[in-house]
């Protein structure tokens, strides 16, 4: 297509066009759209008003382009729905008409009008008029904004050499993108090396060995073991990461990063853990069963205690794999010795999906399930001779049940290594949640993206999950990363913060509050400066600055004051 030429309208008087949408009956069923359009015609600077059944429809977009050209409009207001869903569409129409796409404002008269006042048509109509008046006042002061074109380094960094990290690396490398895989231990495999089998009985070791061989043999993957990230600079498409590899400092340039560091099982401080060699964690029992450990071979009874350290005030989350894992091991013990007495002490059984079949099989094979609540947790006693006694209050009998197991297995919480997560979070400028896991940008709309562009998350770094979900999420993260690497350049948005150094006092309040690490303090000047490639235009710095030295382009103080004045003039 021919390159579009943008008209220079910066010095022109505002000629505002207002397009009021019926949105079928979503808006027009409550709001008097004709009255809103007539009112918009009376506002200062408005030279043309249109009403449309669906302003987002393609034929309406074509009409809008013609109207902009015919009436020489240089500012546009669309009174319709949410800018979250439709702003980009209308901005593209402005570009097609030769206008800077930022000379645009949406008045959300649906979400903020008809939907929330569906039983008050008169009030909804008046509010719609207010929203349009405020939008016109703001857009009249809007100036064209420029965008930066940033080159892309077509390679990736994957942090973590577990199943998720290796899967992400292979997914990208198979598409032809060079990948550097950083693993802090001396071997790949991560948490997967401790797994005996999947929930449906498939052995993990052959799968893991094949995965490692593919990674180490892949020509596009560079594996760095005994490696630790010490510094990260840059932004999406242009990251520069320093890696310490066995004491040797290396710089890795990359366009995207996938964080797939693993987690580990909590070492509990309760239930006698560490006081007897017959008290296991689930992963330890996996190993003992696989090695035909004498403690397992001679055991006549076993007890599993669920939710150890999780679903409690300190860790309110469910680790998601513990119930299935315990029941898998209970079934293994039953297969080794069908006469063994096996008890699972639980708060809630959470065997997701087809894993429910494990629970049914365990019940059929004679595994006994005893429920307890948080206020009446089991009590474990370790005698001087190493024998175990577990006392639990049965919620049906309402009396204590005393068990004398030969084996006790604790289904402990999956937790992040907090120091590692915090350090990576600071370097990559990404958030962690209250439990210490990395936090995605949006659970449904951007489930593997961080708020910081170009950085993605997968595996246990994100949250406890089974192996197949780690693999699926790793492929999703790699696919999202590939959308960046597939481009020759990236466009940085025009709505960014700008520091007036004449007003800046160098207090660094903006540096501390910026969630994206986009503001630097210049020591020599004693002033702050915004890296516009990192800035997301959230406006936190502008609101924080005590000297009003920071302006958020597209949301200047004058524009916001104009909106407030119009809101209060009603």
Which residues fall in each region the model found?
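Residues forming the flavin
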Residues: 1-570
